[in-house]
From Swiss-Prot:
Full protein name: Serine/threonine-protein kinase par-1
Residues covered by the KA1 domain: 1143-1192
Active site: 292
Organism, as annotated: Caenorhabditis elegans
Enzyme class of the recorded protein, top EC level: transferase
Length: 1192
């Protein structure tokens, strides 16, 4: 039997005998199929069952209808950083969708038939792994729900056995993160009792370029030893699965901390920032750049110390060799990246550090915008607002970081000497970190290792493992002993020895055919690939998306022979990445003499990885070559079947309670950011929902006819006049000034920028990174932002895995759109997913194109009064796969969708960005039907009338604004899934070629990359978006409908299309902005006025006063007080007023915003004041006076 690296392996669960009897007839009927499938080396895995009652929990489940992306992009992993917030593992309903990148790709053989693969409760049940996704025990996947009885029995079995599941020397506790190709488990080291995070990666789901990225990432992490960088402890590998044992940061992300507690005081920010600078300087000293530094990738341990995670975009640099890949999240990206210039490396991280410092101190982003185009212009302009509470020393330090010219940007060595950095640390000036010498070994720990492993290894072998840093059991135990705050006493050592004898189920390398499951070390080591870098160590996007990896506690030990057979068939040798030998070998505790040692799990249970029935094999073995070859004696290891069944839902999650993950990358489609509560810091977080992914498709808020009508309204003269009238009255000039606009954006709420793994740009040009340029975008013809690409807008279309039809998608979109409106309330901080390079690059191009002439002028889209980005606060970016984004247009479309809509440049992929497609309407099934002119306006226009319009299809990045739906960028500048918030990873304009997206883009649904586990990419997108939207965007209804779009109007043009953009440009050129008279209420869109509600404000420190009055009553009171104080004002939205006070001819002119907002979790409303322009003293005087006079 072969353990197909490509095939899915059904998990076995102990089921009550009655259940078996009920299903026995079916099983007998299908036994022929099972036998037949057993002959297929890649497709099946025979599992030896210990009892006749053992059967697949998913038997009888039909997965044929699941959509499956063909080879999802590796970087789409969103669960990557293992400490991140726990993906929602719905206790009874872990999303069964395998599609998130793990759909049942090609459920061709028995799977399609829907016949149960499990053989009757015979001794060895054979399962055709080919197309069936059997939910693992404890996964109550949607499929499992269909079977009812079997699903319940599997869940009960999981509850019984879950506590006994081991991988190597680690006891698995719970799932803390999930993605398309990876799952992150919280585990406890049985020897030291130390908690770790284990990232379990399905290698069969990764294409060669993705494996290369993982290889590089692991290689880099193995070199790092800094107290403020997430540590890699161990690398284990089977033929189909890679296990990375990482440091567990229980305190969560800095981003979450800011959401829960608001901005830090400078003293607290200084303590954190010193650690960040020390870690990044250490990276630069080793010629490594991170390239995705942001608040979401900064974790906190239990002592609130910083841990930098997510090295998925990291790379090495050398002076004189320029890099050209656009990586990272746009709000944190340096100007040279937006301008498409090559860069040395460190200066890009320095800029990101400046943005992080600003974020820590202010709780908002220095550069933000309604769309990618606005953001790009503000970053290139380099203007940001200094909060009145920021100290002069901190302001001066920021000026060293945020320098547009990279040559003039300070180095971190100089930053360390800055005055602000060392205030309060006069006796401990920040100095470069000195790494302990490699040859410095702790003899006490060595002695303990000798006592613990006395049965398996002698001192020489232990010293060799530690000195050569093999990243296997002994080395990991050595490292973890160093993490203990107290030494192990004799009783603990004795207990550890007893645990070693029977507790661990070894990860079988499955190399070579040994019928009894005996695996020779030579075999394991010989197959290992050379690169220690191979295994991805971080919780990063790269392979972080777990496709529903499931752990079955009761799974029978599969014979190693099957896996071995398959491995032989597979071209790529599997190897444990960094360690020269598999951890399983270590687990087996091979005797020093080399005698065979048989290791059995406590309950036969192990992590069962079920490979997706793809025809792909693990392309690259991540094991590095063995540093030594022990004797040929074999160690018999119980094989653990692959953990991932891409077809199956993340079943294990159901059995396990969802818990906060501090280090794991959030699922691309977290249900919504939830502020940390007191316990959250301890690592307990509300589960972010990966689950939502199964619900929706790409949301389209209205059908084609409605969209047409809607777009016609937008382009009508009345609409245009409303747009133009949006500029503020008396202070209009100031508002429109670049400084004011930039200042407005600076206050934009924190949006999380989750890194999205991106596909490389469509056309490989400069191959700075192997992985970044590898694949060709199948859809790569389409420029992200500017050009018109293939008529089919892959963004929406891509999600259509084999079976998804455009009609299905439309239905999904409608469903999603119907769901999303209620989620429209933005949380002030939005995640900003990292964007893949290809998307970013195309976005950049389209921006430039739009500036050059399509929009009728570079500033047409962006020009105008200050954007109300402030309300957006930091928006977090969910890490979505670029693959998803790329899926629509080969990755470029994804970025384009975000930027095109926003930038006004036509987007080649209609679906993805709804941008105007000058040449042809996008053909993407979901919303591509609209002609380019019909493309909705971006948020700036705030034309999106209905909430659904605001919501961006969850298709990860690509569908950010699927053509069918206008995205109301104004509401949340960068909702998590939007392009703007995503980390880009792609070549600069000059180097658009990116292979990564090539097959993945075409094959994986755009949404899948987000880590949606839903059956279809569309579902994943919709649900992901809906989840994200809850937190990230404001009530788009209110904003988009009522807001006349004064300051933001500029960004509208591009998204509507060339016609609208050109019309706006012509009108502005002729008449200039029209400012409504002072005190005059600017016209607002009447549509659905009654539905508009105050925005729910997550950051409450800007509230000056609260009241239980109705919002409209509060607005009347505010206008009354403004009139009494002689203030000019313009009601720009139903619950937001732009106010002006003072003499424009003197320095006393002050502009500010007043907004009635709803307080979270309280039945109260509050008034938010935000200064737009003028001195802080002048603003405080008038704002305090008005606040005192308000009778609320």
């Amino acid at each position: 039997m072969s353990s197909a690296s490509v095939g899915k392996k059904p998990e076995h669960v102990n089921t009550p005998p009655g259940d078996n009897q009920q299903k026995s007839s079916k099983e007998n009927q299908k036994s022929n199929k099972d036998k037949q499938s057993s002959n297929q080396p890649p497709g099946q895995i025979p599992h030896s069952t210990n009892s006749g009652t053992r059967k697949s929990s998913g038997s009888g489940l039909k997965t044929a209808n699941l959509k499956h992306p063909a080879r999802p992009s590796t970087e789409s992993s969103t669960s990557s950083s293992h400490h991140r917030r726990p993906a929602q593992e719905m206790n009874g309903t872990s999303t069964a969708t395998a599609t998130g990148g793990g759909g049942t790709s090609g459920a061709t053989t028995t799977a399609s038939s829907g016949a149960p693969a499990a053989s009757s409760g015979g001794s060895s049940a054979r399962y055709s792994s080919s197309g069936r996704s059997h939910p693992t025990s404890g996964s109550s996947s949607s499929h499992a729900r269909s079977t009812g009885q079997s699903g319940m029995s599997s869940r009960s079995a999981a509850r019984r056995n879950d506590q006994d599941v081991h991988v190597g020397k680690y006891k698995l506790l719970k799932t803390i993160g999930k993605g398309n190709f990876a799952k992150v488990k919280l585990a406890k080291h049985v020897i030291t009792g130390h908690e770790v995070a284990i990232k379990i990666i399905d290698k069969t789901a990764l294409n060669p370029s993705s494996l290369q990225k993982l290889f590089r990432e692991v290689k880099i992490m193995k070199q790092l030893d800094h107290p403020n960088i997430v540590k890699l402890y161990q690398v284990m590998e089977t033929e189909q699965t890679l296990y990375l044992v990482l440091e567990y940061a229980s305190g969560g992300e800095v981003f979450d901390y800011l959401v829960a507690h608001g901005r830090m005081k400078e003293k607290e920010a200084r303590a954190k920032f010193r650690q960040i600078v020390s870690a990044v300087q250490y990276l630069h000293s080793k010629n490594i750049i991170h390239r995705d530094l942001k608040a979401e990738n900064l974790l906190l341990d239990q002592d609130m110390n910083i841990k930098i995670a997510d090295f998925g975009f990291s790379n090495t640099f050398s002076l004189g060799n320029k890099l050209d890949t656009f990586c990272g999240s746009p709000p944190y990206a340096a100007p040279e990246l937006f301008s498409g210039k090559k860069y040395d490396g460190p200066e890009v991280d320095v800029w990101s550090l400046g943005v992080i410092l600003y974020t820590l101190v202010s709780g908002s982003l220095p550069f933000d915008g309604q769309n990618l185009k606005e953001l790009r212009e503000r970053v290139l302009r380099g203007k940001y607002r200094i909060p009145f509470y920021m100290s002069t020393d901190c302001e001066n330090l920021l000026k060293k970081f945020l320098v547009i010219n990279p040559q003039r940007r300070s180095s971190l060595d100089n930053i360390m000497k800055d005055r602000w950095m060392n205030v309060g640390y006069e006796d401990d000036e920040l100095k470069p970190f000195i790494e302990p010498p490699k040859d410095q070994i702790d003899e006490q720990r060595i002695e303990k290792l000798i006592q613990i492993f006395q049965l398996g290894f002698n001192k020489a072998a232990i010293l060799e493992s530690v000195e050569k840093e093999k990243f296997e059991d002994i080395h990991a135990t050595y490292l973890l002993l160093g993490e203990r705050k107290s030494d192990m006493d004799a009783s603990e050592i004795t207990m550890a020895q007893s645990l070693l004898s029977h507790s661990s189920i070894n990860v079988s390398s499955s190399l070579g055919q040994h019928p009894a499951g005996v695996i020779t070390r030579e075999h394991v080591t010989s197959s290992s690939a050379s690169g220690s870098s191979a295994s991805p160590s971080r919780y990063s996007r790269s392979s972080a998306t777990a496709t529903g990896a499931s752990i079955t506690a009761g799974s029978a030990l599969a014979s190693a022979a099957n896996a071995q057979k398959h491995q032989q068939s597979s071209a790529a040798p599997s190897s444990g990445s960094s360690s020269s030998r598999r951890s399983s070998q270590n687990d087996a505790a091979a005797t020093a003499a080399g005698g065979t040692v048989v290791m059995s799990g406590t309950r036969h249970g192990g992590v069962q990885m079920r490979a997706q029935p793809t025809s792909r094999q693990a392309t690259i073995s991540l094991l590095q070559p063995p540093s030594y070859k022990p004797s040929s004696n074999t160690t018999q290891i119980a094989q653990i079947p692959p953990l991932f069944n891409r077809n199956s839902t993340a079943t294990s999650s159901a059995a396990q309670p969802s818990t906060g993950i501090t280090g794991t990358r959030k699922i691309a489609d977290p249900k919504g950011r939830i502020p940390l509560n007191s316990t959250a810091v301890q690592g307990h977080r509300t589960a972010t929902g990966a689950v939502a992914a199964n619900n929706g498709g790409i949301p389209s808020h209205r059908d084609h006819a409605q969209q047409q009508q809607y777009m016609n309204q937008l382009t009508s003269s009345t609409m245009m006049s409303k747009l133009i009238n949006k500029t503020p009255a008396a202070g209009g000039t100031a508002a429109t000034s670049s400084s004011s606009s930039s200042s407005a954006t600076s206050t934009a709420p924190l949006q999380k920028s989750g890194s999205q793994i991106s596909h490389a740009p469509t056309e490989p040009v400069i191959r700075e990174d192997d992985d970044e340029n590898n694949s060709e975008n199948q859809n790569g013809n389409v420029p992200l932002i500017g050009g018109v690409g293939p008529q089919t807008s892959p963004a929406v279309q891509v999600p259509t895995e084999d079976a998804t039809s455009s009609s299905d998608k439309e239905q999904q979109q409608q469903k999603a759109s119907s769901e999303t409106p209620k989620e429209s309330k933005p949380s002030m901080i939005h995640q900003s997913p990292s964007m893949p390079p290809s998307q970013m690059m195309t976005a950049m191009e389209s921006l430039k194109l739009s500036e050059s002439g399509q929009t009728g002028g570079p500033t047409v889209a962006t020009g105008g009064p200050p954007q109300r980005a402030t309300s957006q606060q930091m928006s977090r970016s969910a890490t979505t796969n670029s693959a998803n984004m790329g899926a629509s247009s080969g990755g470029a479309a994804a970025a384009a969708s975000a930027t095109n809509q926003l930038s006004g440049a036509p987007s080649s992929t209609g679906a993805s960005s709804q941008q105007y497609h000058p040449k042809a309407p996008s053909s993407s099934s979901s919303s591509s039907t609209n002609p380019p002119h019909q493309h909705q306006l971006t948020h700036n226009a705030s034309f999106s009338v209905t909430p659904s319009s605001y919501q961006i299809p969850t298709s990860t990045a690509v569908n950010v604004t699927s053509t069918g739906m206008p995205t109301s960028s104004s509401s949340s500048a960068f909702p998590r899934n939007t392009r703007n918030r995503q980390t880009f990873h792609g070549k600069t304009e000059k180097d658009k070629g990116g292979d990564d997206s090539s097959d993945e883009i075409g094959e994986t649904p755009g949404n899948v990359s987000i880590g949606a586990t839903g059956p279809s990419a569309n579902n994943a997108e919709a649900t992901i978006w809906s989840k994200l939207s809850k937190l990230t965007r404001r009530d788009h209804n209110r904003e988009s409908m009522t807001q006349p779009v004064s300051g933001r109007a500029g960004t509208i043009g591009a998204s509507q299309g060339q016609q609208t953009a050109a019309a706006l440009a012509a009108i502005r050129e002729q008449s200039g902005p029209i400012a409504p008279g002072a005190g005059q209420v600017a016209p607002s869109l009447p549509i659905h006025e009654g539905d508009v509600k105050p925005r729910s404000l997550r950051f409450t420190w800007s509230m000056k006063t609260t009241s239980s009055l109705a919002p409209d009553d509060m607005m009347r009171e505010i206008r009354k007080v403004l009139d009494a104080n002689g203030c000019d004002y313009e009601q720009r939205e139903r619950y937001m007023i732009l106010c002006v006070h003072g003499d424009p001819n003197t320095d006393s002119l002050v502009q500010w915003e007043m907004e009635v907002c709803k307080l979270p979790r309280l039945s109260l409303n509050g008034v938010r004041f935000k200064r737009i322009s003028g001195t802080s003293i002048g603003f405080k005087n008038i704002a305090s006076k008005i606040a005192q006079e308000l009778n609320l």
